[in-house]
Amino acid sequence: MIRSVQTPHDDPSSARATWEERREFGRSLRKVAPRSSHAAWTPWSGRRDPIDVLEEQADSREPDLVPIRYGRMLESPFTYLRGSAAVMAMDLATTPVSGIRVQACGDAHVNNFGKFATPERNVVFDINDFDETLPAPWEWDLKRLCVSLHVVARMRGFSRSRTATIVETAARTYRERLRRASTSTALELWYERIDVDHMRREFPESYLPRLEKDLAKARRKDHSRALARLTEQLASTTRFRDDPPLLVHLDDTDSTMDDVLAMVEQYRLSLAEDRRDLFDRFRIVDVARKVVGVGSVGTRCWVVLFEGPDRPGGDHIVLQVKEAQRSVLEPYAGPPTQGHDGIRVVVGQRLTQAASDLFLGWCEGPRTGRHYYVRQLWDVKGQSDVMRMNAAELRYYGSVCAWALARAHARTGDATQLAGYLGGTARVDRAIVEFSAAYARQNAEDHAALVDAVAAGRVQAAVL
């Protein structure tokens, strides 16, 4: 469990505390959690069976989709890691923490970073998944990112030394970016973003052709691409193209359709007035259920097709209405202050992202009371294929992910306290490398346990 930290009466995190006081307070927290202590990972004797943790999550999901989730997790240790955020959250809660909290992503593996367009149509790089976001220790996000880099590197066949270099570079980048952030103003931190020019400068020259290809692909992954891939023309109407079980229409007699329509109207009220005015120009033309991601498979998710009147053939947007379940961090970090998991996701995203989706909002199921958040399905979104990167490329890519994570933590935590705690040496970097190697072995064992559970018929998996 998280170790609480009692701060002095003159709270060094308050606006009254000086920069030096906050930095020294961060340094003092090394007595609570020595920096070298972050290297430790040993499963405790009462550690829950990871399959039980996954099955507990499955209880709240659509039963017919749960086998798809397990099928995707079976593919590799990395896909298992992506789908087992609840297992790693349970494990991280037993590890040392300094007591400094941030708005944590909660699932900061390397595939939850990527490129997307801001409302101003600039392409930026940032965290792009917030289903598990919650105020929590910064260590949990950094460790999940670095473990994922280790797992990917070993799957790519890189040596132990090259893998350690990849992970250490990410940990060092995180530390150095926070050190730099500690001398920035609040406004400078708020306005900072990682744009295309930053990415071009950070990556090695050998990777630039692939980066440009990825950027071009991201720009093409917009509403037009979503329409071409997911819809078809029936007479004069645009409709989603059924692709069961991944994309299916609801039965006209299903009351869920009425629920989705009511949720869209409720969602409308969560938008700022200017965005609501834009949204009101569109009308619903179709609704379907969609399977998304790995860890999210089985949560309720619909895509809603809207058409506007502004040009011949219609102007379309596709919104995703996705269930927001309890964060995997909540049992260990405490409940959200919002009291609504859809709002929790939206607030966390707005706090940590440099720029958020134009149509980001929330709603609630009228009959079930389930919480949802809403965003555009595709709006110039791109992700680099880490499984095709060589060691140098993965090293640089991991460092950009760590930069984005440090920027998010600096915005929502106290960068000066964090910088004071982390210090100017590689002590934390080396500890994170050691932890990542140890936990990657644990992840491989847990993945093997899932393979065995499927083989024994304990859980059902569907590979599509």
Language model: regions and residue ranges:
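Positively charged, low-complexity intrinsically disordered regions
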Residues: S4-T7, V345
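General secondary-structure propensity
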Residues: T7-A17
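Conserved ATP-binding subdomain of kinase catalytic cores across diverse folds
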Residues: A15-T18, R22-C105, V110-K213, R219, ...
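Long, low-complexity segments enriched in small/aliphatic residues
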Residues: R193-M263
